[in-house]
């Protein structure tokens, strides 16, 4: 039997003589290892996090710095850096909402708080020696190449600029979080298609 379960079993007893299905209570003076009622650790963490804000649990939106406007140049720059394409206005609106939520961290007082660290900062991580084992023959290596030229890999060109025409209605997206709607506006292509039908 697991040592943890032995500790729990020895520190609890049945509330009645029958005890079938009844709540277990610890003996007097015993340390409780398991809480009587489950609690949501995420909610508890969120409350503790909010208590560290300068202005309590309620966040004063006027203290936040101004939201940067999202334009076509910024979208293409983010797409090039992240290699992720925004496929709809909802994706751009979600990005704007994430920026807005991240700006609340500016109000967190981190004075006298040590930065987080990982266990790897104080532990050694041994790696294998870089010793060549059995080299693969060239024909097996070239199986991974879709296109070849004079026994060289041909890679697709990188950082190709995407189309510069505006795919989204950015005026509506920049007003989206101030309107207070839970979802982003309809896609520009859908609105244009419906306008043609009329």
Swiss-Prot record:
Keyword Ligase: yes
Catalyzed reactions per annotation: L-glutamyl-tRNA(Gln) + L-glutamine + ATP + H2O = L-glutaminyl-tRNA(Gln) + L-glutamate + ADP + phosphate + H(+)
Keyword Mitochondrion: yes
Function: Allows the formation of correctly charged Gln-tRNA(Gln) through the transamidation of misacylated Glu-tRNA(Gln) in the mitochondria. The reaction takes place in the presence of glutamine and ATP through an activated gamma-phospho-Glu-tRNA(Gln).
Residue stretches in coiled coil: none
SUPFAM superfamilies found in the cross-reference section: Glu-tRNAGln amidotransferase C subunit
Subcellular compartments: Mitochondrion
InterPro entries: Asp/Glu-ADT_sf_sub_c, GatC
Family: Belongs to the GatC family.
Gene Ontology CC terms: glutamyl-tRNA(Gln) amidotransferase complex; mitochondrion
Protein name: Glutamyl-tRNA(Gln) amidotransferase subunit C, mitochondrial
More about this protein: This protein may be expected to contain an N-terminal transit peptide but none has been predicted.
Gene Ontology MF annotations: ATP binding; glutaminyl-tRNA synthase (glutamine-hydrolyzing) activity
Entry keyword set: ATP-binding, Ligase, Mitochondrion, Nucleotide-binding, Protein biosynthesis
């Amino acid at each position: 039997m697991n040592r943890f379960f032995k500790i729990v079993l020895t520190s609890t007893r049945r509330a009645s003589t029958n005890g079938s299905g009844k709540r277990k209570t610890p003996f007097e003076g015993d340390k409780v290892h398991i809480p009587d009622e489950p609690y949501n650790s995420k909610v508890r963490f969120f409350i503790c996090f909010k208590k560290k804000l300068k202005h309590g649990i309620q966040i004063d939106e006027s203290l936040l710095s101004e939201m940067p406007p999202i334009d076509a140049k910024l979208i293409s720059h983010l797409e090039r850096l992240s290699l992720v394409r925004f496929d709809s206005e909802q994706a751009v609106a979600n990005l704007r909402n994430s920026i807005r939520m991240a700006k609340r961290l500016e109000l967190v007082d981190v004075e006298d708080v040590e930065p987080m660290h990982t266990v790897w900062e104080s532990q050694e991580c041994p790696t294998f020696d870089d010793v060549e084992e059995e080299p693969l023959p060239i024909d097996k290596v070239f199986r991974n190449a879709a296109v070849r030229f004079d026994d060289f890999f041909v890679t697709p060109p990188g950082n190709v600029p995407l189309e510069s025409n505006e795919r989204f209605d950015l005026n509506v997206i920049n007003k989206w979080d101030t309107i207070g709607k839970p979802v982003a506006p309809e896609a520009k292509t859908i609105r244009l298609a419906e306008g043609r039908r009329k």
